[in-house]
Curated annotation (Swiss-Prot):
Domain HTH lacI-type: 5-59
Source organism phylogeny: Bacteria, Pseudomonadati, Pseudomonadota, Gammaproteobacteria, Enterobacterales
Keyword match Zinc: no
InterPro entries the UniProt entry points to: HTH_LacI, LacI/GalR-like_sensor, Lambda_DNA-bd_dom_sf, Peripla_BP_I, Trehalos_R_gpbac
UniProt protein name: HTH-type transcriptional regulator TreR
PANTHER family registered for this protein in UniProt: HTH-TYPE TRANSCRIPTIONAL REGULATOR TRER, LACI-RELATED TRANSCRIPTIONAL REPRESSOR
Gene: treR
Length: 315
């Protein structure tokens, strides 16, 4: 669909010069917040985005995709991004990285800016708070990672399967008093689904569940390990490698050497520092490859949005 307005029209309606509109479109400095808001309001009102030909004339790539991670320091998300980038480069796309910090408001702002720049597509690392309404305009050119949504392409991890694999391995090793360190249920995947899988295994095998759900941070793992270590506990399952790193530090300080740790992640850091920990690989690298491939196929009209589930494997 052709834009009814040009950059010149937006400049006139906003009462600014064309160069100012260009700075706003490119998210450049040198524009006051008040002016930026005025220009963005006009663009939003008229549904404006720059044409591909206009971008090409400014020397910008005609093939751009965005990757919106939740945290730039996330070990798991970085593993997925590492396989996405080569896939995009190979097909001639220039990826740009953005961070949501688990904020739906930030995601909305990022998507608004990306729409105005008329980029080709988005890989969005999902989290609780991302609604279908928020991402609705991107249905044909967005892939959710680690979350799913009706009608949208998604690449998800087998959260229940990952915990079941760990619990089964520990059970086969003779452990019957297995505690769990996880994430609050407000996080549907890493939190609720993994905790529910732990509880389901305990119920099936008549084990007594002992769990704490502090959060995602390493420090939270460290601070809450004591609350799930009973006198008869022989193993501790952690919902993430980050929690396992915190738990391991606590166990070392307390000189507890007989307790078996297990975690979901199999990140390079955990394997290097603690090769003794039983880990499950949820397929972060494969998820990155699949997400990039799915987005490229959608951009080129070769497939419709679909849900992909990456199987977990014992590392």
């Amino acid at each position: 669909m052709q834009n009814r307005l040009t950059i010149k029209d937006i400049a006139r309606l906003s009462g600014v010069g064309k160069s100012t509109v260009s700075r706003v479109l490119n998210n450049e400095s040198g524009v006051s917040e008040r002016t930026r808001e005025r220009v963005e309001a006009v663009m939003n009102q008229h549904g404006f985005s720059p044409s591909r030909s206009a971008r090409a004339m400014r020397g910008q790539s005609d093939k751009v995709v965005a990757i919106i991670v939740t945290r730039l320091d996330s070990l798991s998300e970085n593993l997925a991004v590492q396989t996405m980038l080569p896939a995009f480069y190979e097909q001639g796309y220039d990826p740009i990285m953005m961070e949501s910090q688990f904020s739906p408001t930030l995601v909305m702002e990022h998507l608004g800016m990306l729409r105005r720049r008329n980029i080709d597509g988005v890989v969005l690392f999902g989290f609780t708070g991302i609604t279908e309404e928020l991402i609705a305009p991107w249905k044909a050119s967005l892939v959710l990672l680690a979350r799913d949504a009706q009608g949208f392409a998604s690449v998800c991890y087998d959260d229940e399967g990952a915990i079941h694999i760990l619990m089964q391995r520990l059970y086969e090793q003779g452990h019957r008093n297995i505690s769990f360190l996880g994430v609050p249920h407000s996080d549907i995947t890493t939190g609720k689904r993994r905790h529910d899988a732990y509880l389901a295994f305990c119920k099936k095998h008549k084990l007594h569940p002992v769990a704490a759900l502090p959060g995602l941070a390493m420090k939270q793992g460290y601070e809450h390990t004591a609350s799930v270590i009973m006198p008869d506990t022989t193993a501790l399952v952690c919902a993430t490698d980050t929690l396992a790193l915190g738990a391991s530090k606590y166990l070392q300080e307390q000189r507890i050497e007989t307790l078996q740790l297990a975690s979901v992640g199999n990140t390079p850091l955990i394997k290097f520092l603690h090769p003794e920990i039983v880990t499950v690989d949820p397929g972060y690298a494969e998820a990155g490859r699949q997400a990039a491939s799915q987005l490229i196929e959608q951009i080129n009209g070769r497939c419709d949005p679909r849900r992909i589930v990456i199987p977990s494997t014992l590392a």
